[in-house]
From Swiss-Prot:
Monomer. It comes from Yersinia pseudotuberculosis serotype IB (strain PB1/+). This is Arginine--tRNA ligase. Its EC number is 6.1.1.19. The gene is argS. GO terms for biological process: arginyl-tRNA aminoacylation. GO terms for cellular component: cytoplasm.
Length: 576
């Protein structure tokens, strides 16, 4: 249930009845402080200005016309014309009852869209490193959130699986008489890549053969295609290990690499020329964009085909957007790519729109993100200044979590201990990233992310175990809670109202691609439950009705924390 949407609709109706235009905005928000009610409507001032009225006078008229019977216990006008709405506790109690038994915590079904989400995008013949972490886990949180709401989500792993490097790798594998590349681990391939590059730079005959293999590969030579396929398969098998460890939903079926669009590139260049968008310039094919200026203030030229006939990333990205709309039937396309690629994407999409490949009604959204930094504020590196491999980072996370958890649980069975350690270690790395606004850089700090207090995965996972332990101690389950829910205390009301705001939060996350909003919400819920737990007797409540009511609040808290963390890809545990 989306209380904000319900109240917005009611306040808008009252505003229109009071003389406001039909497109007026009620601007209903969750109140920042309890003294201002549960929700506040802030749209009166802007409407009053348009109507030439005193804001307070309009607010009084709106309140007269506002029908919140059974929903609000009190409506107040504050300051120059804010309308404060206090929810009726009986109404809140009924909605909690509904959320407890309804599918998806009572979140209303959406009109399903086909949404393509582009994320992760590692390179073939390279190990994944920390630079892939943000795209992978933020993108996956978006995918999980959209799927929870009922959208048809297409995961698109835009793997770097094409280019001149493949001629070099195929030639080097042949040189080493090791065509059976599938027997090699990716670490060997990484070494092969370095050795192949060194040989390519130093041996002209080898370089000629490598370049010849590029041409053969691009023209569909069977031997080269087989070798290329092996390189891709080995890489993706190793990446799948990382995805599984990260509890990320990507599989080999989601790979849509650069090579997928190869056949489209000549057609796109020809079409852009035919439409008068692309022209020849010094042998290359260029699209000049008035929207972007070069340093001389002239329209910027974007090359889509080099004079040697080769294509560029921009050409591939144009084809990619076209394919996602025309072939996949996308209603919305999201790209989780770092902020440094913003201008490149904007230029490609400007061409896409001008060419009519994707209509304006289909959003192309760059959900950009900042960098992961070390404590020194510089890009996160190894002590020797090298790139941190993702597998090494996850190994260290589990090792550090192991020390933390094993210390506190000396009697936990080995299998359960291993599962808890893994959930906490991997969860800590993911949550530390997801809990920060994606648009900013963030500092990677082991001590902060593994802390058992503050907005961290270990704290949230512990908060969940604390709630479910109530039911273990009580020896009850949901089916035994048969009495109606009543709310008698302020702390009960605060927790119940916040729990009912889950739909507002998940809708915001889906619209804006901002998982940190979910993290902040879950942290709030955990804090409100903690206060409720400390001040309101649950198992020893003064009556059976209040005992069951408080157990129901605890039950919805557990379900909300678990579901919210699941949309982030964070695993919960029953004990910690």
């Amino acid at each position: 249930m989306n209380i904000q949407a319900l109240l917005s609709d009611k306040v808008s109706q009252a505003l229109i009845a009071a003389g406001a235009p039909a497109d007026c905005e009620a601007q209903v928000r969750q109140s920042a402080k309890a003294q201002f009610g549960d929700y506040q409507a802030n749209g009166v001032m802007a409407v009053a200005k348009k109507l030439g009225m005193q804001p307070r006078q309009l607010a009084e008229r709106v309140v007269e016309l506002l029908d919140l019977t059974g929903i609000a216990s009190k409506i107040e006008i504050a300051g120059p014309g804010f309308i404060n709405i206090f929810l009726d506790r009986q109404w809140v109690a009924e909605k909690v009852e509904y959320a407890l038994t309804a599918p998806k915590l009572g979140v209303a079904p959406v009109e399903p869209q086909t949404i393509v989400v582009d994320y992760s995008a590692p390179n073939v013949a390279k190990q994944m490193h920390v630079g892939h972490l943000r795209s992978t886990i933020i993108g996956d949180a978006a995918v999980r959130t959209l799927a929870f709401l009922g959208h048809n989500v297409i995961r698109a792993n835009h793997v770097g699986d094409w280019g001149t490097q493949f001629g070099m790798l195929i030639a080097y594998l042949e040189k080493m008489q090791n065509e059976n590349a599938s027997d090699m681990g990716l670490s060997d391939l990484e070494l092969f890549y370095q050795q192949a590059k060194k040989t390519y730079d130093e041996d002209e005959e080898f370089a000629l053969r490598a370049r010849a293999y590029v041409v053969k590969l691009q023209s569909g030579d069977e031997y080269c295609r087989q070798m290329w396929r092996k390189l891709v398969d080995i890489t993706m098998a190793q990446n799948q290990v990382a995805y599984d460890r990260l509890n990320v939903t990507l599989t080999k079926d989601d790979v849509m690499g650069e090579s997928l669009y190869n056949a489209m590139l000549p057609e796109i260049v020809a079409d852009l020329k035919a439409k008068g968008l692309a022209v020849e310039s010094e042998g290359a094919t260029v699209v000049y964009l008035d929207e972007y200026k070069n340093k001389d203030g002239e329209p910027m030229g974007v090359i889509i085909q080099k004079k040697d006939g080769g294509y560029l990333y921009t050409t591939t990205d144009i084809a990619c957007a076209k394919y996602r709309y025309e072939t996949l039937g996308a209603d919305r396309i999201l790209y989780y790519i770092d902020s440094r690629q913003h201008q490149h994407l904007m230029q490609a999409w400007t061409i896409v729109r001008k060419a009519g490949y994707v209509p304006e009604s289909v959003p192309l959204e760059h959900h950009m993100f900042g960098m992961m930094l070390g404590k020194d504020g510089k890009p996160f590196k190894t002590r020797s200044g090298g790139t941190v491999k993702l597998s090494d980072l996850l190994d260290e996370a589990v090792e550090r979590a192991g020390k933390l958890i094993a210390e506190k649980n000396p009697d936990m069975p080995a299998d359960e201990l291993k599962q808890v350690i893994n959930a906490v270690g991997i969860g800590a790395v993911k949550y530390a990233d997801l809990s920060k606004s994606r648009t900013t850089d963030y500092i990677f700090d082991w001590d902060n992310m593994l802390a058992l207090d503050g907005n961290t995965a270990p704290y949230m996972q512990y908060a969940y175990t604390r709630v479910v332990s109530v039911f273990r101690r009580a020896g009850v389950d949901e089916t035994s809670l048969t009495l109606p829910l009543v709310i008698t205390e302020d702390r009960e009301a605060a927790l119940a109202t916040r729990l009912l705001q889950f739909e507002e939060i998940i809708t915001t996350v889906a619209r804006e691609g901002t998982p940190h909003v979910m993290c902040s919400y879950l942290y709030d819920v955990a804090g409100l439950f903690s206060s409720f737990y400390e001040h309101c007797q649950i198992l020893n409540a003064e009556s059976e009705e209040i005992r069951q009511s408080r157990l129901k609040l605890a039950m919805l808290t557990a379900k909300t924390l678990k579901q919210g963390l699941d949309t982030l890809g964070i695993q919960t545990v029953e004990r910690m």
